[in-house]
Amino acid sequence: MKSISGNKISSTLVLLLILMASCKKNSGPSEPGNNNNNQTSADSAYHPVDPPVPPTIGFFNDVWSGKTFVAPASISGTVPNSPVTDSLFIDLNEVVVKVPMSVYGNNSNLWMGQMVTQPGLIQYIKDLSPHIIRAPAGSVSDVYFWNGTDAHPAPDDAPANLLDAGGQSVTANYWYGGNNASWTFSLSNYYALLAQTNSTGIITVNYGYARYGKNADPVATAAHLAADWVRYDNGRTKYWEIGNETYGNWEAGYQIDLTQNKDGQPGLVTGELYGRHVNVFADSMRAAARQTGATIYIGATLYDKAPAQYDYASVQGWNQGVLSQAGNAPDFYIVHDYFTAYAANSGVNDILNSANSVPSAIMNYLKPQIQTAGLSVKPIAMTEWNIEATGSKQNVSYIAGIHAAKTIGSIIKNQFGEASRWDLANGWGNGDDQGMFNIGDEPGASLWNPRPAFYYLYYFQQFFGDRMVEDNLKPANADMVSYSSSFSSGQAGTIIINSGTQNHIVSIDFKHFPAGPKYYWWVLTGGTDNRDFSGKVYVNGTAPSGPTGGPLDYASLKAYSASLNGTIRVSVPPLSVVYLVADKK
């Protein structure tokens, strides 16, 4: 055995120490203060590569545009010096998806008044910036005649009575577009609302009429009525839905009076029947669009989950029937989901957990079904979503706001092409009100007072960029979730949501980001009223202007800011959302 000289031993030890130090430095999370200022040029080189547009988004991103972040007025915020509980790493070069603006949509309805005569409400909607506002009104769409007037609300072949889910005859109560009464919403004012709020539309045509119409060919007649609307629209609206929740036993046309039907339709709607009818509607509507030189996209309704054994007949096999018969006639598919158990007094955990689980479950269910039918995956639009919880004023609480922010992030991550929350305004119902604004019947609240969900979605768009990027949150527990983004103007952002009851200190490190001198953030928290479901939201500690909702001077509030000298540290309080943007160099 040969001996080793002292010089060789010394050199070997030095090399080993260097290697060990290098391994230690790169084997775990960076320590606070060791990020941006110590990056190599490669670490701060911002060269994002956009992935292909996912088929579930498709043409909804044809109108994609970059976002420019404008730094808000700010005051110095407190940077926590407590130990870090969670570490967030964000890679600006790893683009998950270019964010479709259409995921921020909302729903109008026919009972919230003419709206365009309400400048305060219009300003709130402009600030919310939904991009898409759906019409005419959920299930009412299947008893709505867009060209009806006071003198002639519905066609002569529309029956005076319809069958309900139990097969009982009930008064039809048709709605119509030419109704200019103050309590409803005319079609002309729907178009005016879109213009005043810089929004586009998504319109649901009356499919129910194809079922309950009494003429010799009700399907062709209903399709012709839809095509006439396309002509009247004259290119203003690109996105059209054939019926609302057409599988639903609550919808007009689910069950028809066979003694009045003249084309041999079955008593109950099926997926196969609807799929065949989709072809008729699509042909008529596309012909109308060609006549006006417009481009339109037509959607068909699918059921968004596996039916339970106890579900009624029409739901069983609905998707297979639609897909087999409609084929390639639809341009996109429509789903609705209200996330929590129907009419249940759901708790905080059930509500907030659903925001993550439901969008991914929908995609995991639908895509294989479409492919099994031998069809290509197409854009998927969730044109109604909210929570179904009742009994504790959950819908008007800040928990519904956290759920809204968490859901939008999940919808983007799961690559939906469109999403419209239900709805702009509805009715108090002792706090079971899904409306974003008070229609005027909430005790003690001002007319059109924004509910907490408004604030959570307003700041989401302010501080979420045009590209979702990869992030890696190493959380202390499952309560934490993050959604990160970049702006075309160069800034980086993240939204951190704490669904639990413990305070968290989160460190944030960026990769491939030439960081600037400052970062800005907002913290949204709830109040102490109404137990778990406070009707108040505080924005950076600023209290609501009234007994419920949030601060009405939200547009002029100052963000928190701090110097960006390395790793960012931010406190995320219990049951809160933090919206943060780091400036560019």
Language model regions located:
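Acidic, Ser/Thr/Pro-rich beta/coil linker or hinge segments at domain junctions
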Residues: 513-568, 572
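Aromatic/acidic polysaccharide-binding cleft in carbohydrate-active enzymes
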Residues: 382-464, 468-482, 488-489
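Noncatalytic carbohydrate-binding groove/subsite architecture in carbohydrate-active enzymes
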Residues: 270-404, 414
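Bacterial N-terminal signal peptides that target proteins for export
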Residues: 2-12
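Carbohydrate-binding surface patches
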Residues: 477-529, 575-581
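Bacterial Sec-dependent N-terminal signal peptides
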Residues: 14-54, 58, 63
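N-terminal catalytic cores of secreted or lumenal carbohydrate-active enzymes
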Residues: 48-328
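Flexible loop/turn segments at secondary-structure boundaries
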Residues: 111-115, 140-144, 210-212, 247-250, ...
